[in-house]
């Protein structure tokens, strides 16, 4: 018979049972973490969607009538007539008279139809580079300047500023670029010529449907992303990382997200965040005005620039010219206000 009776002592049972309790508490935390994360993400989605939909409606109210009006002006020959008047001006900045058609198309429309017109002309690589920079500064002005107007910049003034900076950029490049007659050649897919009002309307409806879907998807995604960045405290980290760059550009450090958005997705698609930042009071209107002037010259630095680089135009001429002129423009504005 055992000294301890029928039941020998258990070392394990005599020790305090701390392990299982601790394991259960850790397990509970791990189980609740996905739920907490889900609730926070759902909160971001719930806050973002009403705001994004209202901005989508505003953007489409601006974009769709303008795109129809421009198609009508092209169809009746108004753009060609205006281009003929501007031919002498373009000759002064090292461009042929035909280039005026490309620039005028750019003023009213996004870059893709502008590039389609550009590829129909016989240009040298030097002329194509100058024209590309002009179009990058001044494209889709009715829409992009409406966004700028809603965030603190007078519509007429920002239109005049961007067209003026296009001409300044052309003058600078015409003076700096070496003379050359290397041909610019890029094979583009043929576009169907509009031969009737019915065809014009059908093309507009088709492009409008694509535009509507694109805007809803991009704007909604951007607004949700903005709320997520705020919810998890990442907005301040981004602003802190980009603050030295903003100071170099002459911009307030609080506009880091606007600058980043404008250079990743452009001013039209980035309008949601830009408008929201101002209307929610996170950025003052005079600060947004400085950002609008900077982005007016230098925005969508990745996508828009690479469109022309893919056609054989130098990345450095396009990138450097726009960025330097944007910095000079903002610092000039700040100095004139002192």
PLM feature spans:
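Juxtamembrane "helix exit" motif at the C-terminal ends of alpha-helical transmembrane segments
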Residues: 69-79, 113-118, 230, 301-310, ...
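Selected transmembrane alpha-helices and immediately adjacent juxtamembrane segments
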Residues: 28-89, 163-246, 324, 328
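Alpha-helical membrane segments and immediately flanking helix-loop junctions
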Residues: 96-153, 249-308
């Amino acid at each position: 018979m055992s000294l301890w009776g029928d039941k020998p002592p258990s070392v394990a049972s005599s020790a305090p049972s701390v392990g299982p309790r601790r394991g259960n508490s850790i397990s509970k935390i791990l189980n609740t973490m996905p739920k907490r994360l889900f609730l926070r993400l759902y909160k971001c989605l719930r806050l973002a969607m009403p705001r994004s939909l209202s901005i989508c409606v505003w953007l489409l109210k601006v974009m769709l009538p303008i795109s129809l009006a421009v198609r009508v002006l092209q169809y009746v020959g108004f753009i060609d007539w205006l281009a003929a008047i501007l031919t002498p001006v373009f000759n002064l900045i090292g461009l042929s008279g035909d280039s005026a058609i490309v620039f005028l198309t750019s003023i009213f429309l996004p870059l893709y139809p502008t590039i389609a017109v550009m590829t129909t002309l016989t240009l040298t690589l030097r002329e194509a580079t100058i024209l590309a920079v002009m179009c990058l500064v001044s494209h889709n002005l009715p829409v992009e300047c409406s966004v700028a107007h809603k965030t603190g910049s007078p519509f007429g003034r920002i239109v005049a500023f961007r067209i003026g900076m296009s001409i300044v950029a052309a003058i600078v490049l015409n003076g700096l670029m070496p003379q050359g007659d290397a041909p610019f050649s890029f094979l583009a897919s043929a576009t169907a010529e509009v031969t009737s009002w019915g065809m014009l309307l059908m093309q507009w409806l088709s492009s409008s449907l694509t535009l509507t879907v694109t805007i809803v998807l991009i704007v909604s995604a951007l607004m949700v992303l903005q709320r997520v960045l705020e919810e998890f405290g990442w907005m301040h980290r981004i602003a802190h990382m980009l603050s030295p760059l903003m100071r170099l550009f002459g911009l307030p450090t609080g506009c880091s997200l606007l600058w980043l958005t404008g250079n990743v997705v452009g001013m039209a698609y980035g309008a949601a965040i830009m408008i929201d930042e101002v209307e929610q009071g996170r950025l003052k209107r005079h600060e947004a005005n400085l950002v609008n002037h900077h982005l007016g010259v230098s925005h969508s630095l990745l996508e828009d620039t690479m469109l022309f680089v893919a056609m054989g135009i130098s990345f450095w001429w396009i990138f450097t010219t726009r960025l330097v002129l944007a910095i000079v423009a903002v610092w000039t504005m700040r100095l004139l206000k002192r």
